[in-house]
Design a protein with these regions (language model features):
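Gly/Ser/Thr-rich helix-start
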Residues: 23, 37, 54, 78, ...
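Periplasmic/extracellular, small/polar-rich flexible segments of pilin-like filament-forming proteins
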Residues: 2-6, 75-187
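Conserved hydrophobic beta-strand within the GNAT/NAT acetyltransferase core sheet
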Residues: 25-28, 69, 143
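N-terminal leader/signal peptides at the extreme start of proteins
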Residues: 1-23
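N-terminal single-pass transmembrane signal-anchor helix
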Residues: 15-50
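Residues at secondary-structure transition points
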Residues: 20, 52-56, 60, 130-134, ...
Length: 187
């Protein structure tokens, strides 16, 4: 040390204080707790808006498929009943043959990664018993979730060429138009 430098002098009982920059552990824990509470409140709302968006995507895909079925009907005087697997590969149901190329989209969006629903088309039920109308008279298009986590409250959205709309819940029970849950399917 140089001879002309002096050390700081302190009065008796004085302590040299240094100012530390940063947060205490308690402050950090309070902030983490607040963020956790906000996330617990916001996440269910976010999930419900994603479900609503997916249902809207399915309804739009059903409307598009119904229009395609009507165009198909005007050209061939019959509707095309088909089923599709989870990958969106569709095949006509008996006794029809599967046209090539397949004229309808079997997923609710263009890419299989973005598609939450698989589309199908079946003959309309008669309304009495277990019979169905011929595909030359009526067709019912439906959208079912590709996985159970897509929409746990609505299992199947359906609309027929007669204009009748319906849906089923997670237990496969038909949700009636008079039921408050029907607005989940068709607002």
């Amino acid at each position: 040390m140089a001879a002309n430098q002096q050390l700081p002098r302190f009065e008796t009982g004085q302590v040299m204080r240094t100012k530390n920059a940063g947060f205490t552990l308690i402050e950090v824990m309070v902030v983490v707790a607040i963020i956790g509470i906000l996330a617990a409140i916001a996440y269910p709302s976010y999930q419900e808006s994603v479900r609503k968006g997916r249902r809207a995507q399915a309804r739009a895909a059903l409307a598009d498929l119904l229009q395609q079925q009507e165009r198909y009907f005007t050209q061939r005087n019959t509707y095309l009943a088909f089923t599709s697997d989870n990958a969106g590969v569709a095949s006509a149901t008996f006794p029809q043959t599967t046209p090539s190329p397949f004229p309808f989209r079997a997923l609710s969006s263009d890419g299989s990664v973005n598609s939450a629903y698989v589309l199908e088309s079946n003959a309309c039920p008669t309304g009495t018993g277990s019979g169905v109308l011929p595909v030359t008279e009526c067709i019912r298009v439906s959208a079912k979730p590709r996985t159970a986590t897509v929409d746990p409250s609505v299992k199947l959205l359906m609309v027929a060429t007669t204009g009748e709309k319906s849906c089923t819940d997670a237990t496969n029970a038909v949700i009636l138009k008079t039921d408050a849950k029907f607005k989940l399917c068709w607002p």
